């Protein structure tokens, strides 16, 4: 998923003033995760590849590619080499952990969606304040 793609069901209108939807912040983190996954997949399928070729192959700005490479290296799933970044043995552990995390997030999202639908169908209570 590219940064410009929209996630269905997330209203993009800001709250009053400069307030930001909590869902927008979560979506930004998911966009970053998706970019990291794209990069890790590309590195796993390719021989060592440098940052410029990687950016071009994934149609990403170099600064975003560099940041994702930094995060993946910090996690220990890639390491630099003379020819570019390479995937380490810890990648398998990363994929397992990601799958578990996504399962937990999916459960939480389904729970939140059911609560949001429930509240959306209720008439306002008319109460003011907290």
Annotate the PLM regions:
Residues 7-39:
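Short alpha-helical segments that sit at the start of domains
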Residues 1-12, 83, 129-130:
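Long, compositionally biased intrinsically disordered regions
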Residues 10-16, 20, 97-130:
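Amphipathic alpha-helical dimerization/coiled-coil segments
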Residues 83-100:
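Basic, amphipathic "hinge/linker" alpha-helix immediately C-terminal to the N-terminal HTH DNA-binding motif
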Residues 41, 51-52, 70, 83:
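Residues within the helices of the helix-turn-helix
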Residues 31-48, 56:
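Short amphipathic alpha-helical interface segments
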Residues 73-83:
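A short, conserved structural fragment
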Residues 30, 59-74:
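Short amphipathic alpha-helical interaction segments
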